[in-house]
Amino acid sequence: MNIPEILDFLKRLSENNTREWFQEHKAEYQNVQSSFENLLATIIARISLFDESVSHVRPHDCTYRIYRDIRFSADKSPYKNHIGGYINARGKKSNHCGYYIHLEPGNCMLAGGSWCMPSNMLKAVRQSVVDNIEEFRSIVEDPAFKKYFPVIGESHLKTIPKGFPKDFPYPEYIKCKDYTVAYVIPDSFFNNPLFIDEIVSVFRQLKRFADFTNYTIDDFE
C-alpha cells in the first residue's frame, strides 16, 4: 500500500492526460488500482470492528472508474486525476451514508454523508435535525468530531428553507443542501506509518453522524 506511489502516478496522469500516455502506462495503473483496493480492504476490515454493516463490502465494488464521462463536458480530458473509494453498506450509488476516501495530489480527503438527496429525503433529514436538535448538536459540536469535521454540508441555502421555523436557533444545520462532511488531508499524511489508525479514528467519528442521518434516509430506500 504505497500511497505516495499512487499519488505520484496521479500527478503524472494529470500532466499527461491522454489516451496514448495512459495506454503506455496501463500496467502501472493496474498496480495502482490493486494497491488502492488493498488499502480499501484493510480499511473495511478495521471499520467493520465498529460498523459491522460494511463487513460484506468488497473493495472492487467501492471504487470508481478512472474514465471520465466527457459527453457533456467542455473538458475532454479522458481520465480523472484522482482515485476514490466509497465504503457503503448499501452500495456506492445509495443515498445511505458511508465512508469515502479520495486520493488526489494536493487534495486528498476523508469524507462521508449523503450528496444529491431527492428533495423529499432532504426535507425529512432537515426535519429530523429540527426534531432531534440536541442529539444532533451532541454529535456535530463534540470537539472529537469537530477536530475532523468543523463544517456540515458542502453547500448551503442563504435563508431557512420553506416550511421550517424562521426562528430556529441553529439555522446553519437546516440550510444545508447536503448532509456531508469532509476532512482534507495533506499528501504527507500518508508518510506516517500509522496513517491507517488515523483514518480509522476519523471514520469512527463519522459513523456517529452517519447513524443519525441514516435513521431517516433508510426509510426511503
Model-derived features: positions:
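Extended cationic-aromatic binding surfaces that line active-site or macromolecule-binding grooves
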Residues: S35-G91
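Compact, glycine/acidic-enriched structural inserts
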Residues: P105-F164
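Charge-rich, low-complexity terminal tails
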Residues: F168-E221
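Contiguous, amphipathic alpha-helical segments that mediate oligomerization or scaffolding
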Residues: E5, E15-F50, S201-F220
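Aromatic- and glycine-enriched beta-alpha-beta binding-site module
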Residues: R71-V130
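Short His/Asp/Glu-rich catalytic/ion-coordination signatures at enzyme active sites or charged loops
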Residues: N2-N31, V181-F195
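Sequence-level motif detector for i,i+2 pairs with an aromatic at +2
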Residues: D61, K80, N107, C176-D178
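Well-ordered alpha/beta subsegment
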Residues: I3, S138-D142, D218-D219
